[in-house]
Every structure is written in structure tokens, then in C-alpha cells.
Amino acid sequence: MAKRDYYEVLGVERGAGEAELKKAYRRLAMKYHPDRNPDDKSAEEKFKEVNEAYEVLSDAGKRMAYDQYGHAGVDQSMGGGAGFGAGGANFSDIFGDVFSDFFGAGRAGARGGPQRGSDLRYTLELNLEEAVRGTTVTIRVPTLVHCKTCDGSGAKKGTTPVTCTTCGGIGQVRMQQGFFSVQQTCPRCHGSGKMIADPCPDCHGQGRVEEHKTLSVKVPAGVDSGDRIRLAGEGEAGTLGGPPGDLYVVVSVREHPIFQRDGKHLYCEVPISFADAALGGELEVPTLDGRVKLKIPEGTQTGKLFRLRGKGVAPVRGGAAGDLMCRVVVETPVNLSKRQRELLEEFRGSLQGNSSHSPKASGWFEGMKRFFDDL
């Protein structure tokens, strides 16, 4: 049967570079690898075809001969079955990370020893007051802990793990795959060299069981959404005597009905009456430390910002506290009584012809008049 074009086999253009060839080869080698396709002769043949194509195209000399003469130009240099390992392809370079993903390890001892437990993440919701002042909370976290029945060994009480019969206790097995052989982590003992002949009935040989752990978390003052608190050793238990992982508590601060936070500064809106805005006055505004008095000068407009220094948030890593920025919103009176309406009508009449009472409005009308005059 005629051989397929090597570029077609790898699914690349004839001008493909080294990186593109390598990427295509890795993808196809993973797809057709015999361990992923047991008892599939078609996949095995495609795996060999992919190896052969890459051996030629990854070697500059062989690729040049192939581009000029086709398969005839490289059949002799291939040595009639010298195999993938005899060519220009670098086995460890290409397959080191492939087998690391595929088998869980590609080199001796990669998984043979104790394994650290996985880290855990827990989202902790706080209100603004708790985040600013700091607090201590109790949380319940689902995790994996050492099985107390077998003390984490995975073996039934009174028994011990035995030497793995698949790898003979070395944790690695050598597999012949077509043109080459590969040493991989033992699929039965996962590199430990030991196997559980009589598993623990509680953890089923895993050495760990699911459990909810109750923990006390001290939250420092000044935290904000996205800040993380690390609790060392409070993650999942390790395996084969490995250390536990860590627990990361991620802070999420709920929205506040009054204040908005921006770093160490707080913002709020303060509604004031039309009369207070015009005549000035004094009112109480809320802060996280209680109410404080704010003096409103006469003629205050909507949008005016008043800064209350030091009434913001003290940064979690130290430094001066931020400020509270109060934005004034002048409210228009509604649901007027007859008398109130009469007074406002009288007031409006007194303003006509006197631009000094409304400097912004007067300037706007003057600008509009000039605009239309210029048309």
C-alpha cells in the first residue's frame, strides 16, 4: 500500500516550522497512543505512521531529501525499520511532558514517594463593617483527611501493604510501544512500589476519607474583596505520608446600602433639602465609627464633595486610614401643600431678572443665546 504524504499525516503545510511540527506530532501521538487505544490495530498503525512522519520532517537533511524525491529519497536513510529512536527525533524532548500528563509521571520516582495534599479554596463573605474592622469567623470546609481506621495506610487494620506484583516494588514498568520502549509509572501502585492486598473497609484502600473540618479564621482589619488568607496545613491530607496542602480563604465583601469602597477610601451620597442647600446648615452624616456633624455652606450644589479625613479604611498592610467622601444631592421638594406652593411661586418671581442668584444657569442661557445668534 502506498505511503501517505508525511505533511498530510501530521496535518501541516509544507512550509511548517519546527514548533508547528512538534505541536502537531504531540497532539497526534497522544491521540493514537496504544495505551489510549488498547487492542485497536488501526490506532497502532496510525501511531507508527505519525512517528515515521515526524522522524523525517524533524530532521533537516531527511526533510530536504523528502521534499526533493518523496518517499524514495528517505526510505534508504530510514534503514528499513531502524525505528523512531534511531532518527533525529529527541525522545525525551518530545515525550517528557506528554507522558508526564498521560501517565502521571515520565521518570523514575516521580510519584513513588509521599505526595503533598491538594490546596483548597474557600470563599468567605463579609459585610463592610467586618472587613474594615476585622473579625474572627468559624467556617466548615469539606476536605480529605487521613483515615483513622488504617492511619492513612489504606490497608485493613492488622495488615500492611505488600510489594507490588506488577513492578516488583520499583514503582516503574517498561513498555514496548512500536518503535521504542518507554519507562512509565506503574499503573497499579502509582509508583509507590507497594499495593494494598486487603484494603481498609472505611477508605477502600485510599488512606483518606471525606470530612467537614471546622476552623476558626482570624480576619485582619482592612481586607477587601479578592484578598486571601492562607491557613498552612489545612488543605487536603497528603498520601503515602506526604504533608497536607494549604487552605486559602478568599474574601468577598458584600455591597453596603450606604457606602461604596474604593481602596482605602469610602464614598456615600448625602441628601440635603433645597432650603439647606440655599441657606446652609449643619447635618449629621453616617460613618463606620458613628455619626459626625457636617457643615453645609450656603449655595451648595448637587455633586459637591465633602472630605472627612481619616474616616475611610485603614489598609490591611498598615498606613494611614483613607477618607470618607460625601457627595451632596440636593432634593427637589415634592407633594407640596398649597401654602408651600404659594411661597415657592413668590420666591421664583423674586429671582427673575437677577442673574446673581443662579450664576450657572445664567451662564448656560448666555452661551445658548450666542450659539443661536451665530447660526
Curated annotation (Swiss-Prot):
Q: State its location(s).
A: Cytoplasm
Residue positions binding Zn(2+) 2: 164, 167, 186, 189
| One Pfam family hit | DnaJ
Q: Where are the zinc fingers (CR-type)?
A: 134-212
Q: Which cofactor does it need?
A: Zn(2+)
Q: Where does Zn(2+) 1 bind?
A: 147, 150, 200, 203
Instruction: Output one GO BP term.
Output: chaperone cofactor-dependent protein refolding
Domain of life where this protein originates: Bacteria
Molecular function per GO: ATP binding; heat shock protein binding; unfolded protein binding; zinc ion binding
Read off the Gene3D superfamilies from this record.
DnaJ domain (1.10.287.110), Heat shock protein DnaJ, cysteine-rich domain (2.10.230.10), Urease metallochaperone UreE, N-terminal domain (2.60.260.20)
Ranges occupied by CXXCXGXG motif repeats:
147-154, 164-171, 186-193, 200-207
Keywords for this protein? Chaperone, Cytoplasm, DNA replication, Metal-binding, Repeat, Stress response, Zinc, Zinc-finger
Comment on bound cofactor: Binds 2 Zn(2+) ions per monomer.
UniProt keyword annotation of Chaperone present: yes
J domain sequence ranges? 5-70
GO CC list: cytoplasm
> According to its UniProt record, where is this protein mainly located?
cytoplasm
Q: What does this protein do?
A: Participates actively in the response to hyperosmotic and heat shock by preventing the aggregation of stress-denatured proteins and by disaggregating proteins, also in an autonomous, DnaK-independent fashion. Unfolded proteins bind initially to DnaJ; upon interaction with the DnaJ-bound protein, DnaK hydrolyzes its bound ATP, resulting in the formation of a stable complex. GrpE releases ADP from DnaK; ATP binding to DnaK triggers the release of the substrate protein, thus completing the reaction cycle.
Which family is annotated? Belongs to the DnaJ family.
The free-text domain remark for this protein reads: The J domain is necessary and sufficient to stimulate DnaK ATPase activity. Zinc center 1 plays an important role in the autonomous, DnaK-independent chaperone activity of DnaJ. Zinc center 2 is essential for interaction with DnaK and for DnaJ activity.
* Self-association state and partner proteins as the record states: Homodimer.
For this entry, the protein name equals: Chaperone protein DnaJ
- Species annotation: Azotobacter vinelandii (strain DJ / ATCC BAA-1303)
Q: Which gene encodes it?
A: dnaJ
